[in-house]
Each structure stands twice: as C-alpha cells, then as structure tokens.
UniProtKB/Swiss-Prot annotation:
Family recorded in the similarity comment: Belongs to the eIF-5A family.
Protein name as it appears in the record: Eukaryotic translation initiation factor 5A-1
Record flagged with keyword Protein biosynthesis: yes
Organism: Nicotiana tabacum
PROSITE patterns recorded: IF5A_HYPUSINE (PS00302)
Note: There are at least two genes for eIF-5A in tobacco: 5A1 may regulate the light-dependent translation of specific transcripts while 5A2 may be a housekeeping protein.
Biased composition (Basic and acidic residues): 1-12
Gene: EIF-5A1
SUPFAM superfamilies cross-referenced by the UniProt entry: Nucleic acid-binding proteins, Translation proteins SH3-like domain
Pfam family of the protein (one): IF5A-like_N
Biological processes annotated in GO: positive regulation of translational elongation; positive regulation of translational termination; translational elongation
Region of interest: Disordered: 1-23
Assigned keywords, A-Z: Hypusine, Initiation factor, Protein biosynthesis
Modified residues (Hypusine): 52
Length: 159
C-alpha cells in the first residue's frame, strides 16, 4: 500500500453530535425536540395513561425553530427522543451586502459572511432601517443541527 491510497474526508465539525438523547417523558414545554429531522421548540406536551397493551405516550406539538412550521409527534414516554443542541450567539452587524447577506463581527475579531438576512418581515425591516440610520446593531443568531438563522436584534446605540 502506498501513501497515496489514504484519502480522508475533512469535515467541518470535530465529530460533535448535533443532537443528544433525552427520555420523552422528561421533555417539557419550551424545551427542544427533533421531529421529522427538524429542530423544534415544544409548545404543548400531553401524556396519555398506559393502556392495556403498552406504554404511556407523550404527544408533542412543536414549532420548527427555523421555518415556523407546526409539527407533531407521539412517542412512548419511556423511549428516547433526539434533542438538538441549540445555541444563540450575538454578533455585531458590520455590513449588509446587495445580495442579501450580512457581514457580522465575531467575538474574536473575525468576520462571518455566510448568513442571509432573515425572512421575517418585521425583523428584516428593523435590521435594514437601523443599519440605514447608522445605529450600532447586535444580531442574535440561532444555530442548531448545522443550520443558522438571524432571530433577534439589539440596538446598542448610535455609532
């Protein structure tokens, strides 16, 4: 075997899992859950009693944290569900490009240029208007399961 036969795919993450298991019976309202491979925020949980043949079941109603779609799932309360690692990070807004991407300043001084402006009209208007007025804006970015989206805005004051 020569050295040339060893090719390894480089991945962006260091093997860190995008989700972790949690027993269905312990997931509460306002928690997070993966339904149909989408990260969701739980808005309603109801539990049914154990039947003649089976486990108690948890009925989850949840909203996709990126698309806002309502999803539902029913899981036996003793089974494990996938729970996404959801992070919120604040970045300072530096620039908005013509093609709808934002340029953000990270904590360590690098720029992050791979995020689009949000699709939410109210948030989009706040960002564009605030930037046009020259305000110092900090954007909250939510990330889960390899996806990122701008989800909030803070006005730090004039530049």
């Amino acid at each position: 075997m020569s050295d040339e036969e060893h090719h390894f795919e480089s991945k962006a993450d260091a093997g860190a899992s995008k989700t972790y298991p949690q027993q269905a019976g312990t997931i509460r309202k306002n928690g997070h859950i993966v339904i149909k491979n989408r990260p969701c925020k739980v808005v309603e949980v109801s539990t049914s009693k154990t039947g003649k043949h089976g486990h108690a079941k948890c009925h989850f109603v949840a909203i996709d944290i990126f698309t806002g779609k309502k999803l539902e799932d029913i899981v036996p309360s003793s089974h494990n569900c996938d729970v996404p690692h959801v992070n919120r990070t604040d970045y300072q807004l530096i620039d908005i490009s013509e093609d709808g991407f934002v340029s953000l300043l990270t904590e360590n001084g690098n720029t992050k240029d791979d995020l689009r402006l949000p699709t939410d009209d109210n948030l989009l208007a706040l960002i564009k208007d605030g930037f046009a007025e020259g305000k110092d804006l900090v954007l909250s970015v939510m990330s889960a399961m390899g996806e990122e989206q701008i989800c909030g805005i803070k006005d730090v004051g004039p530049k």
